[in-house]
Swiss-Prot record:
Annotated organism of origin: Pseudomonas phage PaMx41
GO cellular component: viral capsid
Keywords per UniProt: Capsid protein, Late protein, Virion
Note: Mutations in this protein confer resistance to host-encoded CBASS type II-A(GA) viral defense (in P.aeruginosa strain BWHPSA011 / Pa011); overexpression of this protein alone in the host does not activate CBASS. The above mutations are predicted to lie on protein-protein interfaces within or between monomers.
Chief localisation class: virion
Keyword Cell inner membrane: no
Functional note: The most highly expressed virion protein; probably the major capsid protein.
Subcellular location: Virion
Pfam short name (any one): SU10_MCP
Source organism phylogeny: Viruses, Duplodnaviria, Heunggongvirae, Uroviricota, Caudoviricetes
Quaternary structure (record): Multimerizes.
Descriptive protein name: Major capsid protein
Length: 418
């Protein structure tokens, strides 16, 4: 112990004696973007999964046609085709090459008996590999009921995935006083919730279906959007031909197939494009290089922010998903999503199910019914459990794009001074 002579100042107290001055809660720093970190989790609908194997049935509209395998003369009435599935008596064929219409009168295996020149255009030679398009049916008055047709449903399987995260601290830590506004228990719980939410958001995009075992028990994971597109709509996976000079036409080519099919649950002219930071900048630059900007003297701000990208098939709502950049995906990544066609199918009672362990020191509430359990440990904690399967009803309405690294800059032509 010592005696100080002079004016007392703040450096003379032990550090522990000075009260700290700071904000009442801990600052939480998360990745930023025009979409929130939990963009998909916060907007998709939910439904119920009744088993760990969860799937759905889909039907894709079929437009009938027939491909002629051998040349047929102008007066030929029997045509041999590659496939006759779904063809029935009464259908009208249209030959785009010659303009002739003909009526199908009999299907015998791969041999079709037709009535030529069913219309104004005269019959002509039908070349091999000609595609005959079905443009409807035509029946006589008082006709018999036609052959029924139906589209066979396809089962699209997936599995549920169990997400678990926990929080825990010793009861001494629980009882210890912290700085004003800070709670050891609250912060531990909050960390648990953040991990639980972000892991599910990541799985929505990047999960893959798997069924196996671990510790003698079933272990299953769900298929995310990216893998579903790769499996069911591989033509919708596109890499930019020149990642450092991406053009408007490149983006059209990469997204057009996502508008080819629609389902009866949403807007068939709208999709959402989630980009990383680099991809978002590229989309902005494409718009910026696309037109002319006029600035007047009265303007006090400049610059442009594009939230939609339009072309002849529809429009894309452009969002920067902070998760893509945060987890380190290769720069220039984007996923086009038909959002109304995405749902999370939760198992009953397993949507962020809460369990608390050892409240008050670990030995109390052994018979409690409020999800609190003693476990004989001088600590307390808890867990969150969610189990769901991703239900993507329209993978053909989504797309995966890589290489959106830099927009092709505009070339300005300058004329020499007169």
């Amino acid at each position: 112990m010592s005696v100080y002579a002079g004016i007392f100042n703040t450096t003379l107290n032990p550090q522990e004696l000075n009260m700290k001055s700071f904000a009442g809660t801990i600052l939480r720093r998360v990745p930023n973007g025009s979409a929130p970190l939990l963009a998909m989790t916060s907007v998709v609908g939910s439904t119920t999964a009744k088993a760990s194997t969860h799937g759905y049935f889909s039907k894709t509209m079929v437009f009938a046609s027939a491909v002629v395998t051998a040349e047929a003369a102008a007066d030929a009435t029997v045509l041999t085709v590659e496939n006759s599935d779904g063809l029935t008596k009464g259908m009208i064929f249209y030959n785009e090459a010659t303009g002739e219409n003909m009526r199908l009168e009999l299907v015998n295996g791969l041999n079709l008996t037709v009535k030529r020149q069913t219309g104004r255009i005269s019959a002509a030679i039908i070349a091999a590999n000609t595609k005959l398009i079905v443009i409807g049916t035509a029946f006589e008055e008082g006709s018999q009921r036609p052959t029924a047709r139906s589209i066979q449903p396809v089962y699209v399987p997936n599995f549920t995935q169990i997400f678990r995260n926990a929080w825990a601290l010793t009861d001494t830590a629980r009882a210890s006083y912290a700085e004003a506004g800070y709670s050891n228990i609250t912060e531990s719980r909050r960390d648990c919730m953040d991990f639980h939410a972000t892991e599910q958001e990541t799985a929505i995009f990047f999960g893959q279906a798997f069924m196996g075992t671990y510790n003698g028990q079933p272990l299953h994971t769900t298929q995310g959007i990216v893998d579903a597109v790769r499996q069911y709509a591989p033509d919708n996976v596109n890499a930019m031909p020149n990642p450092t000079a991406v053009t408007y036409d490149d983006v059209v080519d990469a997204t057009i197939d996502a508008f080819k099919w629609s389902v009866n649950v949403g807007d068939n002219t709208q999709r959402v494009m989630f980009c990383d930071t680099v991809g978002m900048r590229t989309m902005q630059d494409i718009g910026r290089f696309f037109g002319e900007v006029t600035v007047t003297q009265r303007e006090t701000s400049y610059g442009m922010v594009f939230t939609e990208w339009k072309f002849f098939k529809g429009r894309l709502i452009i969002k920067e998903h902070p998760l893509f950049s945060a987890i380190g995906i290769s720069p220039g990544f984007a996923v086009v999503v038909d959002v109304p066609a995405v749902k999370l199918a939760y198992m009953d009672g397993r949507n962020a199910k809460v369990e608390n362990y050892g409240q008050g020191g670990g030995e109390n509430k052994s018979g409690a019914t409020d999800y609190s359990y003693g476990h004989g440990v001088d600590a307390q904690g808890g867990s969150l459990t969610s189990e769901w399967a991703l239900e993507l009803l329209n993978p053909q309405g989504c797309a995966v794009i890589t290489g959106l690294q830099k927009a092709k800059e505009r070339v300005y032509l300058t004329a020499p001074a007169p």
